[in-house]
């Protein structure tokens, strides 16, 4: 079975690969134990009254669009976003990051663009870039790989695990800026198959195609930290690779998305051009919702009033007993992350 078919990554095969790897991880220290679980958005390390969150992620094949357009500055923002948005899902405040760049050759202009992007992302997320590694590996990398790792800190009694999610809770969606940084294997195939020039206007847009595709990933850290001081958040999910399946990583319940956010034009056009159905779209892309928060019904007005002028948001659904994600408007059912 191929890992990629028609531009769509085989999530089941990917899950089997990850599971095979995780099963070998049998050793652990007796102190500084992992108090989270492997498979969450971030890992948690016991530090007494506090826990350190630690996770890593990358920008994926979005870098190939950047290379074709010779525009690399937004990739740094993307890399910061992919990491800090994962860290915040447990209530952890991201504090520091290291980057990893694997390149074919050394180009000072690309380095400046990337560094500028990382700096902008760090300012938005309020973290420090404290180190990194640049590997020149032309035999391995034909393009460029941009990734990083973030640590954060949270008081142990304030860790958000999703355990308190119950039937009747409210699901709030925070709007995305566009594609963010996942699904680009599919995106690139659609762009190629339809012979779309990156420097022409994207269908239905006044922006160039490369500008639409490279729109940087939205960072939600400051908004979530601010609202955490006011409202009890029960669970959070970063909608990245795997689309809305990420919602199931909070707790095994049924998440009914009965009023989804309106997908931006980029998703509508990619769906048409790629001849994809709604199920495929929602298990690949964020479809306009970059981050999901679960709260109690009584807290929804305070939540919305706190953030309504800072990020697009709306109540998109509710929690029921059961399993998976249901999007009745499009007759979509999603079961499990892998």
UniProtKB/Swiss-Prot annotation:
Stored CDD domains: PurM (cd02196)
Single Gene Ontology MF annotation: phosphoribosylformylglycinamidine cyclo-ligase activity
UniProt keyword annotations, A-Z: ATP-binding, Cytoplasm, Ligase, Nucleotide-binding, Purine biosynthesis
Catalysed reactions listed for this entry: 2-formamido-N(1)-(5-O-phospho-beta-D-ribosyl)acetamidine + ATP = 5-amino-1-(5-phospho-beta-D-ribosyl)imidazole + ADP + phosphate + H(+)
Record Pfam families: AIRS (PF00586), AIRS_C (PF02769)
InterPro entries: PurM-like_C_dom, PurM-like_C_sf, PurM-like_N, PurM-like_N_sf, PurM_cligase
Assigned protein family: Belongs to the AIR synthase family.
Protein name as annotated: Phosphoribosylformylglycinamidine cyclo-ligase
Source organism: Thermoplasma volcanium (strain ATCC 51530 / DSM 4299 / JCM 9571 / NBRC 15438 / GSS1)
